[in-house]
A protein has these predicted regions:
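Conserved acidic segment of CheY-like receiver
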Residues: 3-15, 20-24, 53
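Acidic, metal-coordinating helix/loop segments flanking the phosphotransfer/catalytic sites
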Residues: 34-52, 69
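Receiver (REC) domain active-site loop signature in two-component systems and cognate sites
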Residues: 59
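Short, glycine/charged-rich "phosphate-handling" switch motifs in NTP-dependent
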Residues: 103
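C-terminal output helix
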Residues: 110-120
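The C-terminal output helix
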Residues: 120-135
Length: 135
């Protein structure tokens, strides 16, 4: 199994972005590219070649679900697992995010010391899944 090393984190809140970046780099040992908007992420996507995308739901101009739809046009989402991050954790909303192709939803506020572990668990699940999406 390939080892996870490159994470694209799309988050408009600079303080959350900074905490997540430090946690993922220092605790997880990942290389993290942080983008403040969906448009910025789309511009950086191909050059960075992420192995995992961590995507905020609520952002101005292009929200997380809209960004995910645009990302799908550029990369094979089955090859690049996506997890949404949100404070909106109602079951219907989570179901909607998963129906868009996200593998999981990480709730905010998050524990910085657990974030790398959560991402690694989602990554491992994605690598163990068959092409049809079942284990």
């Amino acid at each position: 199994m390939t080892q996870l090393s490159r994470i694209l984190h799309i988050e408009d809140d600079r303080s959350i972005q900074a905490v997540a970046k430090v946690a993922l780099e220092a605790v997880g040992g990942f290389q993290v590219l942080s983008c403040a908007s969906g448009a910025e992420a789309l511009a950086q996507l191909l050059a960075f070649d992420p192995q995992f995308i961590l995507l905020d739901v609520m952002m101005p101009n292009m929200d997380g679900p809209q960004t995910l739809l645009k990302l799908r046009e550029l990369v094979d989402i089955r090859r690049v697992p996506v997890a949404f991050m949100t404070a909106k954790v109602q079951p219907a909303e989570i179901e909607h995010y998963l129906s868009l192709g996200a593998l999981d939803v990480i709730t905010k506020p998050f524990d910085p010391m657990q974030l790398a572990k959560q991402v690694r668990e989602i990554w491992t699940r994605s690598q163990n899944a068959s092409p049809t999406g079942t284990a």
